Amino acid sequence: VGCRETFSKDIFHEVSLEVYHRFQIINGITEGQQLADKIPFQYNIDLLKGISFTKGCYLGQELISRSYHTGIVRKRVFPFNLEDQDSMLAVDTILKGSSGKILGKVIHSQGPVGLALLDYLTFTD
């Protein structure tokens, strides 16, 4: 994501799909059709160098540019790792803070690690 390198093929080894997905989760990388109608900033596409602010026109450019220049992003995906390594949170589980305020929800989960879409402003208060 975001870079290209050339390596000799003998340094690579095949890994399972589970290992690949865990790598993505730990690094906050999302994928899938469910992202098609979402704001790229919410899914860290800007942090993964998936948005160019110097190239031509694209659908939603005004919204993306405005969000970038104002620095206002209300929600973002964050990776999480549960302390209890034997537990798991189901997708769409609502996450609440200690005050009971809703912070966001789980969007992907694999064992004790997962991704949550959190209300950035509530989460950082």
Task: Identify the function of each model-found stretch.
Residues 61-62:
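Structural motif
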Residues 31-36:
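A short, charged helix-loop
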Residues 1-5, 37-55:
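The conserved catalytic core of RNA pseudouridine synthases
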